[in-house]
Amino acid sequence: MKERKFFGTDGIRGKVGSGQMTPELALKLGWAAGRVLSRSGTKKVIIGKDTRISGYMFESALEAGLSAAGLNVMLMGPMPTPAVAYLTRTFRAEAGVVISASHNPYYDNGIKFFSTDGSKLDDNLELEIEAELEKPLVCVESHLLGKVSRIEDARGRYIEYCKGNFPAEHTLTGLKIVVDCAHGATYHIAPAVFRELGAEVIAIGDKPNGMNINDKVGATSMGKICETVLAENADLGIALDGDGDRIMMVNSKGEVIDGDQILYILACDAKSRGVLRGGVVGTLMSNLGLDLALQALDIPFARSKVGDRYVMELLKELDWRIGGENSGHILNLDHGTTGDGIVAGILVLAAMRRQNATLEELTSAMEMLPQVLVNVRFEGEHDPLKSDKVKAAQAQVESELGVRGRVLLRKSGTEPLIRVMVEGDDHSAVLAHANLIADAVKSVS
């Protein structure tokens, strides 16, 4: 396949005002996408965004470009990424566009597309859009310009969709839940969803100002929610990231429940109800504890490359339904076409209600093994992973760890780094093993 110049694994992303994230490129991108998408279908595109101050600028630029290509545009305003995917499907739109840099700071932003079925845009369509980007922008004739409207009830539609994933015979009455919205796109959605299902909700990270998204709150900064759960004597906490496609949880003891543990809960619940199709897809970074816990239940487990795009690809290849990353991207293809933090939280709460169990009880049978990650910087064009010395160190550690441990060495795709990850039963031993391999990498760098 031809190498993509603009689109990465998750659309276009970068620092606002530099590189590709400029209003000029957004205008041209809207036009180029409109040219490709207008060849068939409804000629209707939905645009949603998170709460970054730059979102308004990019929304206007994309809107102008799409209209210039003859496509009608429907604006959602600040809404979670999975809400854009959902409403793209329900409105039978030709595509959905999300303006977000997910868990990144406010000064970054990004643009990604969903296809008409709510899944990530096909690689070939992205290549076609890139080809159009190389051409001069030519506006359609005035009578063919696209119209722009606003989806006034987008919030209500998505709230009802989320609630529809919770079993009608149960409620959340009696549960006190802390919900951290990361000052992001779920700020006006997530607290309402859990309140309407009956929970007492304490919302934090729900006051966006355009520049505080993901700032010391949310799924990538768990300190605040852990403190709040303990201070409020809450039953659990739910932390979302800036665009709402990622979730981490906290039990009543203030302990973090990560994506691997959430996958375990969902797989156990599906198996107990006889609806688990196949097994579970994790990634190369998934904790060995998840693998071992699923083995004990005779649930197959497979690993993809890191990234929810690759988890989705492997799920489709295996025809399985549940997969995700330890960072909190959770996919359940029986409940959506993309990662959805709110829905994943609802599914965990549904498992708690069905089994009349706490979050601690649902994760008690899964032992998270100590995991150490060491980053080693190297210089030059050579690949330290091809060194005999590094290979020998890895083989030695793997032999000593046996079946209760794991070693993963990989090169960073963005920096001159070798990432050394070691898992095992004993933290001090794991740390020593990781440093042994790291020293071998340093010696040949």
Curated annotation (Swiss-Prot):
Residues that hold Mg(2+) according to the record: 102, 241, 243, 245
Cofactor list: Mg(2+)
Protein modification: Activated by phosphorylation.
PROSITE patterns membership: PGM_PMM (PS00710)
Superkingdom of the organism of origin: Bacteria
UniProt keyword list: Isomerase, Magnesium, Metal-binding, Phosphoprotein
Gene Ontology annotations for the cellular component aspect, listed alphabetically: cytosol
Protein's GO biological process: carbohydrate metabolic process; peptidoglycan biosynthetic process; UDP-N-acetylglucosamine biosynthetic process
Active-site residues per Swiss-Prot or TrEMBL entry: 102 (phosphoserine intermediate)
Catalytic activity as recorded in UniProt: alpha-D-glucosamine 1-phosphate = D-glucosamine 6-phosphate
GO molecular function, one term: phosphomannomutase activity
Record-listed E.C. numbers: 5.4.2.10
NCBIfam families on file: glmM, PRK10887.1
Function of the molecule: Catalyzes the conversion of glucosamine-6-phosphate to glucosamine-1-phosphate.
Family: Belongs to the phosphohexose mutase family.
Identification of the protein by name: Phosphoglucosamine mutase 1
Species the sequence originates in: Shewanella baltica (strain OS185)
